[in-house]
């Protein structure tokens, strides 16, 4: 029975993203999860400048050079009778929009915290996004094999700064050179750490209880006393893990380990299998769509141009919300009202792509995009659905783009159009000139756009400053007032890459004045796709 198979496939899926501050060890963590899922045989020493093996999930050249994840990688692998869909999000702050969109496509998230630094600014921002969607969070305190802050102090900080209740599942014994392992409070078992096995999977020694003379001797009396004292405090104060509170994003299970040392990474996967939700109902404008519905539905949350320089292609990443994809499936592209037959959908392992025979709710599939698919598009078996919650944010920095070679303006327009479609930047075309203005969240984004224009479109460009402070999407229900506004504000109006009218404000004061002068006009700082 199809319904039974659908329910079984949905129950075995876990789709989650990894979020963290840059350098907390997110890419290393991603790679070790792949190692445990047997998706890769040996872990490359991630980001090691000496090593020629760069992290598996950082596949774009610029990412390899800079050592930061700029685009979202999607990876699928099996683990203990489950299918894991792992989304690695950009760790750099300039790419918050991409991260936000990724978080609309997952059912839960893994928060990686650097044990030496604690809660950092980027983590706070990402948690705000998770809170908007009540995303369940599992926390991993990383780098236990280095000198870190006191674990109790870290828990306190997570609770106070991120406003989420911590439930330690494991508790660390020692740190840095003296790191001996973790004690699992639920199982009453001690997992012993052995250094030097970071890139392979080795059997870990597990003992019942935690008080063992040889372990005590190994870590020394001081570290042992500190461990016992903090463990006692944790056991006294620890509230039990309440799955309901966890699913509401109010409580987070906390695990300790070292991704580089490949220790306790399997605890993370087990936690997702045991506690994290399977694919749930997804909100559309019309109604909530349940994962176990038989009709197919899915939405595009990301577009990536030139994933394979050999193919000069664009791939649309789609999260399946209900039903089943199979080769040759006919689906309706709701925004343009057209039926399409998809026979060449892709599955991913960070740049390695394979054609796909079937996929189920929770899975992320790639569709070849010939310029017709946009971020936020919905595909269904025929029902007119519009999935919600995938916004464009107003950029905070602006530059005018100039060509070194004026004959390449066609390539520049094509490049900027495609890069804006995939969300790498936003493009604005003022009504009073032929200028092309790019908007970004941070400086690095400009570098990425210039780099990709050069590498992928063979266009050499330079940036010039421009007196734009911020941008707002403008809308008005009263056509007469709107036309009057368009005449008066003509010099500051532009059209974005999607053809929407925007107001380019030279200063905050100017924007405030315009809002006061034109109370019937809506000045929006986000636009849904």
From Swiss-Prot:
Residues noted as binding GTP in the record, renumbered to the chain: 20-27, 88-92, 142-145
Domain spans labelled tr-type G: 11-280
Protein's cellular compartments: Cytoplasm
Chief place where the protein resides: cytoplasm
Keywords associated with the record: Cytoplasm, GTP-binding, Nucleotide-binding, Protein biosynthesis
Pfam families assigned: EF-G_D2 (PF22042), GTP_EFTU (PF00009), RF3_C (PF16658)
Entries under PROSITE patterns matching the protein: G_TR_1, G_TR_2
Tree of life domain: Bacteria
GO annotation, cellular component aspect: cytosol
Annotated CDD domains: RF3, RF3_II, RF3_III
GO biological process, one term: regulation of translational termination
MF GO annotations: GTP binding; GTPase activity; guanosine tetraphosphate binding; translation release factor activity, codon nonspecific; translation release factor activity, codon specific
Keyword Protein biosynthesis applies: yes
Task of the protein: Increases the formation of ribosomal termination complexes and stimulates activities of RF-1 and RF-2. It binds guanine nucleotides and has strong preference for UGA stop codons. It may interact directly with the ribosome. The stimulation of RF-1 and RF-2 is significantly reduced by GTP and GDP, but not by GMP.
Family: Belongs to the TRAFAC class translation factor GTPase superfamily. Classic translation factor GTPase family. PrfC subfamily.
Name of the protein described by the UniProt record: Peptide chain release factor 3
Organism: Acinetobacter baylyi (strain ATCC 33305 / BD413 / ADP1)
């Amino acid at each position: 029975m199809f319904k039974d198979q659908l329910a079984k496939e949905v129950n075995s899926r876990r789709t989650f993203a990894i979020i963290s501050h840059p350098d907390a060890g997110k890419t290393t963590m991603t790679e070790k999860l792949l190692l445990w899922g047997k998706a890769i045989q040996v872990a490359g020493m991630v980001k090691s400048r000496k090593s020629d093996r760069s992290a598996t999930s950082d596949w774009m050249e610029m990412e390899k050079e800079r050592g930061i994840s700029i685009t979202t990688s999607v990876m699928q692998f099996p683990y203990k009778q489950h299918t894991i869909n792992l989304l690695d999000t950009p760790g750099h702050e300039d790419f918050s929009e991409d991260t936000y969109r990724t978080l609309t496509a997952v059912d839960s998230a893994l928060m990686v915290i650097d044990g030496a630094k604690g809660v950092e600014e980027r983590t706070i921002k990402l948690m705000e996004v998770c809170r908007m969607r009540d995303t369940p969070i599992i926390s991993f305190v990383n780098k236990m094999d280095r000198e870190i802050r006191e674990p109790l102090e870290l828990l306190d900080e997570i609770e106070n700064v991120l406003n989420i209740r911590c439930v330690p599942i494991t508790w660390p014994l020692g740190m840095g050179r003296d790191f001996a392992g973790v004690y699992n409070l639920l199982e009453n078992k001690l997992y012993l750490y052995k250094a030097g096995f970071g890139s392979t999977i080795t059997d870990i020694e597990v003992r019942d209880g935690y008080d063992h003379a040889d372990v005590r001797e190994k870590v020394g009396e001081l570290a042992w006393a500190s461990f016992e004292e903090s463990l006692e405090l944790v056991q006294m104060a620890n509230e039990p893990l309440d799955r309901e509170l966890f699913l509401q994003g109010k409580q987070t299970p906390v695990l300790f380990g070292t991704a580089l040392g490949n220790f306790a990474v399997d605890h993370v996967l087990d936690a997702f299998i045991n506690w994290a939700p399977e694919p749930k109902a997804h909100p559309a404008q019309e109604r909530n769509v349940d994962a176990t519905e038989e009709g197919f539905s899915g939405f595009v949350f990301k577009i990536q141009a030139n994933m394979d320089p050999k193919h000069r292609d664009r791939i649309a990443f789609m999260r399946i919300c209900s039903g089943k994809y199979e080769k040759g499936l006919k689906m309706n592209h709701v925004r343009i009202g057209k039926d399409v037959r998809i026979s060449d959908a892709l599955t991913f392992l960070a740049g390695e792509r394979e054609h796909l025979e079937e996929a189920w709710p929770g899975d992320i599939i790639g569709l070849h995009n010939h310029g017709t698919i946009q971020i936020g598009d919905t595909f269904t078996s025929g029902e007119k659905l519009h999935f919600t919650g995938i916004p464009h944010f107003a950029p905070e920095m602006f530059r005018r783009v100039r060509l070194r070679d004026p004959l390449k303006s066609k390539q520049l327009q094509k490049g900027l159009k495609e890069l804006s479609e995939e969300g790498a930047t936003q493009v604005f075309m003022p009504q009073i000139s032929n200028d092309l203005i790019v908007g970004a969240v941070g400086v690095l984004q400009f570098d990425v756009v210039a780099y990709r224009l050069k590498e992928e479109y063979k266009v050499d460009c330079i940036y010039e400053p421009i007196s734009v402070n911020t941008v707002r999407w403008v809308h008005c229900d009263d056509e007469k007032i709107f036309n009057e506004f368009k005449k008066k504000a003509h010099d500051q109006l532009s059209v974005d890459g999607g053809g929407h009218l925007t107001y380019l404000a030279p200063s905050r004061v100017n924007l405030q004045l315009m809002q006061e002068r034109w109370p019937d006009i809506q000045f929006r700082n986000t636009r849904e796709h």
